[in-house]
Regions:
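Bacterial N-terminal signal peptides that target proteins for export
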Residues: 1-9
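Hydrophobic h-region of N-terminal signal peptides that target proteins for export
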Residues: 12-22
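C-terminal capping alpha-helices of c-type cytochrome domains
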Residues: 31, 37, 117-132, 142-167
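Short, solvent-exposed loop/turn and secondary-structure capping segments
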Residues: 52, 81-87, 102, 137, ...
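Extracytosolic ligand-binding ectodomains
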Residues: 159-544
Length: 544
């Protein structure tokens, strides 16, 4: 019984669910000198003098650097984290500077577990490792060597963390959106939106009594029922030139703010959406796109994979390990943005490898024989072309050297190998960054069964539907776990924490994430034609 009480107490300390005192009186101007000092210390571990903060752990072990950054453990939201049995408590100002009280059914006041922190008690906690009750903090909590000015800055900064619910949340409803393009086929957009509509309809029907429970929740179940909100998903359809998309997104957002953007189908041009998401601090979660933005500066966009770049990185990795004996020729389409991105990525990844790399566009190949350029390198030829263009080149009368290896990206070509001649097929390997099609039925059995039950299954768009369903499930579970703390940063942190343990992985054999990672799948197969018009894996699932 004592162990159960200790576990419940730890959960309360972490989540801060039962805090009943008045709001903190510390109002901070974002951008003030104190705020700037505190932000540098909290997010980078940098003191006002520009030096890295220093501390000790376990009594006398000196440490410094990244491991002392407050944000690493307490996170961007200030809402804390867990790792195994280790609980890092929430330190956002509206929790830290209030008493922590345990729930009770007996008025007038619940018992105080921990008094509100003051400047003095917080200094004791940070410097000496003593909490507001005078008890020792966890030995893993660093004992920092900071001065009063740094503490004032830290107090100012944490007072700005997770203060009010993020936009898109009302007392009754939580608003989301999904993004599609008018240039997508009607079938593709409809397949995605059918999943969104069916999921939200079922979710709201299944929880139709939750509104009453939220209004009249018993004291010991308030944590469960009070956070309930109905879901509403808005469709943001982008039209016309990419340069106008951000303006269109701003107009949609001004009309109805959303808590997060879920999935969406934007094959190319996602950079415009990403810039909008970052500018407005909106989580944009698991879009289906071949051109995600790959930048350490981006925080709010989380992707399924790295798109065309991932297959180019996979090609580079495989060439270095298995095909480094010869040179590499890349064949690309100068009119195709994806083709150019993949081309440049492979060039960059092989730049210092000692492997000779040449490139030829389709325009150049009209004047040069495919065989003549293949004999120059005696190694590997990589095609960044769609199926029609690739087949036209490979199925010409040109005889290619038997020693030549041909790598084809399945994102460009697809997985239908009926048109690849058998004699050439022996030399062809496919770069494939999702599950092999023959194994997808097993992997997608849960989502496909649900689509069929809802009468929305579209075999032609099953990957689009599977990704949409995955994104909805992840967001649904994450919203449940934030338990009424509707802060966007906290939502992202929950997603980062739970991805590894999900039973459903969409079209990928495995997914994983860690704090500040933004791509759930980073692996690939090398595959070959199976002789039946499809592909089969040639290697195990690998990481670049």
């Amino acid at each position: 019984m004592r162990n159960i009480f200790q576990k419940v107490t730890a959960l309360i300390l972490f989540s801060g669910l039962f805090l009943f005192s008045s709001a903190s009186k510390n109002e901070v101007e974002i951008g003030s000198s104190a705020y700037v000092v505190g932000k540098a210390l909290y997010t980078k571990g940098v003191m006002p003098n520009g030096e890295l903060v220093k501390a000790t752990i376990h009594g006398d072990i000196s440490v410094e650097g990244d491991q002392l950054i407050c944000e690493t453990c307490h996170r961007k939201s200030g809402m804390g984290s867990t790792e195994g049995q280790q609980v890092v408590p929430a330190i956002a100002g509206n929790l830290l500077f209030k008493p922590l009280q345990l729930p009770t059914s007996k008025p007038p006041e619940p018992p105080v577990y921990r008094p509100a922190y003051t400047k003095e008690s917080l200094m004791a906690a940070i410097r000496d490792g003593v909490d507001a009750n005078g008890k020792p903090l966890d030995p893993f909590m660093p004992r920092y060597n900071i001065d009063e000015a740094s503490l004032d800055g830290l107090i100012a900064y944490v007072n700005t963390l997770s203060q009010t619910h993020s936009p898109g949340v009302t007392e009754e409803t939580i608003h989301f959106s999904t993004i599609v393009l008018s240039s997508n086929s009607e079938m593709e957009n409809r397949a995605l939106l059918d999943v969104m509509d069916a999921y939200v309809e079922q979710k709201n029907i299944e929880t139709r009594h939750e509104s009453k429970r939220a209004e009249n929740a018993p004291w010991h179940k308030e944590w469960m029922f009070k956070p309930y909100r109905k879901w509403k998903i808005h469709t943001w359809e982008l039209k016309g030139e990419e340069e106008t998309w951000k303006e269109q997104l701003e107009a949609y957002y001004s009309k109805q703010p959303v808590f997060a953007v879920i999935n969406g189908f934007v094959p190319i041009g996602w950079v415009n959406v990403s810039e909008f998401c970052e500018a407005n601090s909106i989580p944009c979660l698991f879009p289906t796109t071949q051109l995600p933005v790959i930048s350490e500066q981006n925080y709010y966009s989380i992707y399924l994979d790295r798109g065309a770049v991932q297959e180019a990185e996979a090609a580079a990795s495989y060439i270095k390990k298995e095909l480094s004996h010869g040179g590499v020729i890349q064949i690309y389409d100068s009119t195709d943005q994806l083709s150019i991105v993949a081309l440049d990525t492979l060039d960059r990844k092989l730049k210092n490898s000692g492997i000779r790399v040449k490139r030829y566009s389709l325009d150049q190949l009209s004047d040069i024989s495919l065989r003549s350029i293949s004999t120059v390198v005696d190694g590997t030829m990589v095609f960044w072309l769609d199926k029609a263009k690739t087949d036209k080149l490979l199925n010409s009368d040109v005889k290619l050297p038997d020693s030549l290896k041909i790598l084809i990206s399945s994102q460009f070509y697809g997985t239908d190998t009926h048109d690849i001649h058998e004699d050439i097929g022996k030399s062809v390997l496919f770069i494939h960054s999702s599950e092999i099609p023959s194994k997808l039925n097993r992997l997608l059995i849960r989502s496909t069964g649900w689509f069929r039950a809802k009468r929305i299954y579209n075999k032609q768009a099953r990957e689009i539907q599977a990704n949409a369903y995955f994104a909805l499930k992840v967001v649904g579970d994450s919203v449940k776990h934030i338990r009424g703390y509707f802060y966007r940063d906290y939502l992202i942190e929950k997603i980062e924490h739970m991805i590894d343990d999900l039973p459903y992985t969409s079209i990928y054999p495995r997914l994983s994430m860690a704090p500040d990672q933004r791509f759930a799948s980073r692996g690939f197969y090398m595959a070959k034609a199976d002789g039946k018009g499809g592909i089969v894996n040639y290697t195990d699932w690998m990481s670049p």
